[in-house]
Curated annotation (Swiss-Prot):
It is found in: Cytoplasm. This is Phosphoribosylformylglycinamidine cyclo-ligase. GO terms for biological process: 'de novo' IMP biosynthetic process; adenine biosynthetic process. Keywords: ATP-binding, Cytoplasm, Ligase, Nucleotide-binding, Purine biosynthesis. Pathway: Purine metabolism; IMP biosynthesis via de novo pathway; 5-amino-1-(5-phospho-D-ribosyl)imidazole from N(2)-formyl-N(1)-(5-phospho-D-ribosyl)glycinamide: step 2/2. GO terms for cellular component: cytosol. It catalyses: 2-formamido-N(1)-(5-O-phospho-beta-D-ribosyl)acetamidine + ATP = 5-amino-1-(5-phospho-beta-D-ribosyl)imidazole + ADP + phosphate + H(+). It comes from Streptococcus mutans serotype c (strain ATCC 700610 / UA159). The lineage of its organism: Bacteria, Bacillati, Bacillota, Bacilli, Lactobacillales.
Amino acid sequence: MTEKNAYAQSGVDIEAGYEVVARIKKHVARTERLGVMGALGGFGGMFDLSQLDVKEPVLISGTDGVGTKLMLAIKYDKHNTIGQDCVAMCVNDIIAAGAEPLYFLDYIATGKNEPAKLEQVVAGVAEGCVQAGAGLIGGETAEMPGMYGKDDYDLAGFAVGVAEKSQIIDGSKVKEGDVLLGLASSGIHSNGYSLVRRVFADYTGEEELPELEGKKLKDVLLEPTRIYVKAALPLIKEELVNGIAHITGGGFIENVPRMFGDDLAAEIEEDKVPVLPIFKALEKYGEIKHDEMFEIFNMGIGLMLAVSPEKVDRVKEVLDEPVYELGRIVKKADASVVIK
């Protein structure tokens, strides 16, 4: 028995791994940007910071996955957008700290290496990197039979960005009277899917629920997470925002307070929130308490900004998209987030 045959008999297909690398090269090439060095396949990804026009660079990093949204991608056999979700979860976090994404690495673990499927996953990662302006400089694909079922895989990512030291957003600039502005989400994004899957466990995904305005359920559930880099970065460069909150798991209640100090609170007017149809459907079919929805989901707002009142008009001008004036920063009395 040769070593190759022995490894194959244990469930690891080395040739399939080589095929994946060959397939993804064209997708990785799309993400080339200033500072990226070296070719795909080295032991480490390289990035030349000296190419950047940053006087006092501070590196800011983030890592995340996409949770059980992956299980729906597997269920519906649609793998070409889940990679964008992974990138979004990482780069949206670091943009909230004031960082411009520089590069990204991905990690895929699977029970059986299927090159065509994994190419779709990486194509989605590459698309996310293009939207974020980040180079895809490395990654790992691990075939792990016995750990995962043959159709299963997991996906995680790691993003590194840079900020001018003076432009870091850490909550210290947010003050009473700041206006809370919201940018629309594209859908559920990548949080709350354990509940989503329970609510729609008996659905095929082909349903066109009346709340979903003619769209199939599976398409709405797998709508990729919006990447906010190109919207937020000009605001950061122009120093127009005091705080940024990426609305992920925990919804408004957990994430909004992360952008300001313990002595402040966010007062949000519920009727200003552009609640998406999918959240109305989840609340109805899942029989979820209305208040709890704001503790779980983004409800239609994926990024929230704290802005000085005199800068609001300029922020809206720079964004050139619908901007939702949601409320104000106030002195904290009891709760950190008050939804009226």
